[in-house]
Amino acid sequence: MEKRRAEIAAAIITAPTILAMMSTVLRALIFSSCIKNFLIFSMLKHSSYCLAILVYQKNRKAVMWGSDLFYHLRGFSSIFEQKTYIYESILSLQRKNRVRFKLPRII
């Protein structure tokens, strides 16, 4: 777990202001053990609280990035609902773009 946190920290060290802007919910989402084989980073877009999720595989090669990965999670009351939304969105993107990769498992 410490190694994983170090990898996450190393990946976002270049954007400390973005890290400072992240809410407690997002931090919990990133460090959650429910997300397997993925490093999920978030970035606030302007003042709309839309989130861009940049998904990395363990080899740190970007899998997907772009406007399709903007989520508005403010309407979800729990971390579980947010994880479920991200999970379903990734499934949808996989079908749409025929992208193949191992999906995180929601417990």
Swiss-Prot record:
Keywords: Membrane, Transmembrane, Transmembrane helix. It comes from the Archaea. GO terms for cellular component: membrane. It is found in: Membrane. It is a single-pass membrane protein. The chain crosses the membrane at residues 9-31. This is Uncharacterized protein AF_0835. The lineage of its organism: Archaea, Methanobacteriati, Methanobacteriota, Archaeoglobi, Archaeoglobales.
